[in-house]
């Protein structure tokens, strides 16, 4: 598929360019296909091209999906299909799929291995600041003590650092739709520096 070839070539580019080219290629490629007639199984390779076949995304600001709770993944896919969340590649990818298809896709996602955390020597100061913020704002109350998520609450451990930062900022400025408004309340008093420390901490958890 030309879109997949373009995604593959995008991985040789720097961050922002890589993401822009990959998303542009996918949108263009999907627009040229009779997508509503395409079964879920034929769409999965394109899903994995961006989100990672092994559960760990290599594409900037694109989430790793490995080990996400099936219920949470189902809700997000339903929201993309019904355009309650707007992201053109995801809106196109889920177009025409039945509820059962989306549940099947979510089940596949939930069985992918957990994403690999950032492999570096963590900055102890940033890790401690991130841990303290997570405890202060009781992130582990909903996301579980190991931040693996549960039911309708997403896994955060090992998620891409840049994606976590983007999502947290999106909740604060209301550019990211949250079906649980509690997230907007939690992040309201936080600053970009706090988001950066939280993302740094969570991305390095196994």
Regions from the language model: what does each represent?
Residues 22-32:
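Bacterial N-terminal signal peptides
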């Amino acid at each position: 598929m030309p879109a997949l070839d373009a995604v593959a070539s995008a991985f040789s580019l720097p961050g922002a360019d890589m993401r822009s080219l990959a998303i542009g290629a996918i949108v263009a490629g999907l627009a040229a296909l009779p997508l509503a007639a395409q079964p879920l199984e034929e769409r999965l390779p394109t899903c994995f091209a961006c989100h990672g076949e092994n559960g760990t995304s290599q594409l900037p600001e694109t989430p790793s999906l490995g080990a996400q709770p099936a219920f949470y993944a189902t809700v997000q896919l339903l929201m993309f299909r019904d355009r309650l969340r707007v992201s053109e590649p995801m809106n196109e990818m889920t177009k025409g799929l039945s509820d059962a298809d989306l549940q099947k896709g979510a089940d596949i996602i939930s069985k992918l291995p957990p994403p690999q955390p950032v492999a570096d020597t963590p900055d102890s100061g940033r890790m401690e600041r991130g841990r303290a913020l997570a405890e202060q704002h009781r992130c582990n109350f909903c996301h579980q003590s190991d931040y693996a998520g549960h039911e309708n609450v997403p896994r955060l451990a090992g998620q891409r650092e840049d994606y976590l930062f983007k999502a947290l900022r999106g909740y604060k400025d209301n550019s990211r739709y949250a079906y649980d408004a509690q997230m907007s309340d939690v992040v309201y008093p936080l600053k970009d520096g706090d988001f950066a420390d939280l993302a740094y901490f969570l991305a390095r958890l196994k």
